[in-house]
Amino acid sequence: KNKINKIVEFGAGLGRDSVFFAKNLIHTIALDYSKAGISIIDQKIKKQNLTKYLSTKLFDVRKKLPFKDNSVEACYSHMLYCMALNNQDLQNLNDEILRILKPGGINIYTVRHTDDGDYENGIFRGEDLYENDGFIVHYFSKEKIYSLLNGFSNILIENFDEGSFPRKLFYVANMKNVINQ
């Protein structure tokens, strides 16, 4: 709808969504913390001849994002915000996304929410973080989503289910304000 030509995916994992974007002729930069994940995406790029539309970068999103100010049309992440990131990490990431997005740019992300069946199960690690089977998940309320809107306008928050459990998620779309403070 917004005719996005270039997108950055944070927490690309094994590249499912990055490959989808590239196959739909959207120039995609896939960032992930895992060398193994990046290696798998690189193999998919070669095997599926996607070098024109998809590139990768090994990167920790807790650091300053490797892009110039106001240079990116759209950012996307599927459950990255649910990783073991505390509220300050999330605010820093969101501030960095705000910095790199062009005015009117879109940040789309998905998060597990507080109606999820695993919420409040396992070991409480603070800030709506729960550890289950050695894996920490950060759960979101709508209030937490709204708290990350500084410099953004919310376009959409939509509930959806994923998997057979199913996981309960929010799909969030925010637009960078054209004029920021």
Segments (PLM) and residue ranges:
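Short glycine-rich, flexible loops that bind phosphorylated cofactors or substrates
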Residues: 83-84, 116
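Short amphipathic alpha-helices and their capping/turn segments at secondary-structure boundaries
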Residues: 65, 94-99
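A short, conserved alpha-helix within the catalytic core of class I
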Residues: 84-96
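A short acidic, Gly/Pro-enriched loop at the edge of an enzyme's catalytic core
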Residues: 62-75
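Activation segment
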Residues: 65-66, 84-85, 149
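Class I (Rossmann-like) S-adenosyl-L-methionine-dependent methyltransferase catalytic domain
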Residues: 1-54, 58-63, 92, 107-177, ...
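A short beta-strand submotif of the Rossmann-like class I SAM-dependent methyltransferase core
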Residues: 77-80
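Short glycine-dipeptide loop
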Residues: 101-106
